[in-house]
Amino acid sequence: MAGILGAGVQDGLLLKPIKYQWAMDLYDQAVANTWFPNEIQLAQDLADWDKMSDEERHAVTFLMSYFNPNELLVNKALAFGVYPYVNAAETHLYLAKQMWEEANHCMAFEYVLDTFPIDRTMSADTLPMT
């Protein structure tokens, strides 16, 4: 029986029998916790936004736009740095769900950045890299 690490191609093509129950448990938990950004009501958040100082709004804008591309970096790290090197199908399922979650986080940040009256020219993703 192959271990959990390897090329990830020849092994890991069949889900059953499950070799790593912890991976299936994580996958099941992740599926049960599925959420969608556009289902989040932001009315109270928008009201709170209006009460913030300019400095507070700038901090929120900067942090939201900073974390957004970093979610995609986590996704790429999982896709290219981990996924190809695991063999078990159940670990592939969990990693695929985790990659979806990272993309969903990115879309959540975009949803907030698009919903709030934010000047994207002042956000972290538009600042020149030094």
State the predicted function of each range.
Residues 1-130:
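Non-heme di-metal
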